[in-house]
Structures are given as C-alpha cells and as structure tokens.
Regions:
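Haloarchaeal acidic low-complexity proteome signature biased toward cell-envelope/secretome components but also
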Residues: 1-31, 92-98, 105, 156-167
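Hydrophobic alpha-helical transmembrane segments of integral membrane proteins
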Residues: 102-126
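Individual transmembrane alpha-helices with interfacial aromatic-anchor signatures
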Residues: 133-149
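Membrane-helix interface/capping segments
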Residues: 78-95
Length: 167
C-alpha cells in the first residue's frame, strides 16, 4: 500500500470536511425550504399535512406528526440536493443564488412528480391509508408547493455555500 503525503492527506481531510459542511448546509436549506413550503400548504390545503403526510406513518389526522414528518423529509431531501451538487461536474450550479434557485426549482418539481406523485400514493396504499390518491397524483398545488421548496432550497443553499466563513 502506497503511503500518502501529508499534503495529500490534508487535501483529503479538507475535502471531506467541505462535503460534510455542504451536506449540513443542505439540511439547513431543506429545513428552511420546507418551512416556506409548509406555509404555502397551510394557506391552501392544511389537510395535506394533517391527513396524507401523517398517514404515511399511520397517524392520519395528526397534524403534529404530519408537520414533523414533513420537516424531516424536507431536511433529508436538502441533504440529497447537497450531495448531488457536491459532484465536481455540477458544482458550478451553486455559483450564484439565481442559478442554484433554478436548479432547486427543477429538483423540487422532480420531487413533486416522483416523490409526492408516485411514491407517496404507493406508500399510503401499503400502510393501509383509507383512500390513497390515484397514481400518478400530480396536481397544480402540489407542483406549486414543491416549486416553492425548490427555489428556496436552491437560493438558501447557494447563499450558505458562497458566504465567506465567519471568524
């Protein structure tokens, strides 16, 4: 096994730390984006959180469970967003808040169609939800909510990753 030089080890450690920090930024951006999305949901269809999202965990009708689950999902999908953008080929998508918000918008729409439109109805059927939505379940409000999520996710993530470190 070849020994690695101290500078090479240092670069590896710094690279790993940068990835860990970006993933944390992804979680924070995902959480803030989910809060923004949740406001949009609350203004248009609060029952989505109370019934459908809570129903994923067998707690249909429990707004607190729906709210917590939604926040956790949003943070986890924020980490996934950060993980994807950690790839060197995609890293330039975080150069500016506008470019990253656009990337986030596309990401949010993909989550709407795949996650909420396909996976969620299947998951609800598996856990015995009373009346799971038809497949695929893609509505204008669903797309709009996830667009809010994606734009906020991308904008916040770009801001966090491009801000100078604090002393």
């Amino acid at each position: 096994m070849a020994e690695r030089s101290v500078p090479a080890l240092r670069r590896t450690a710094v690279g790993r730390l940068a990835v860990q920090i970006r993933w944390r930024y992804g979680a924070v951006a995902g959480l803030l984006a989910t809060l923004a999305m949740s406001v949009a949901i609350a203004l248009t269809d609060l029952e989505t959180l109370r019934v459908a999202v809570a129903g994923l965990y067998g707690s249909e009708g429990n707004l607190l469970v729906g709210w917590i689950a939604h926040l956790l999902h949003g943070a986890l999908f924020g980490v996934l967003f950060a993980a994807v953008l950690t790839d060197a080929a995609l890293e330039d998508l975080t150069d500016s808040p506008a470019k990253c918000a656009g990337t986030g918008a596309v990401y949010g729409l993909v989550l709407a169609v795949v996650g909420a439109g396909i996976v969620m109805p299947i998951w609800l059927a598996v856990v015995g939800f009373g009346a799971p939505p038809s497949l695929p379940h893609v509505t204008i409000p669903l797309l709009a909510w996830h667009l809010v999520y994606g734009v906020v996710l991308g904008g916040v993530f770009a801001h966090l990753t491009n801000s100078p470190p604090r002393a």
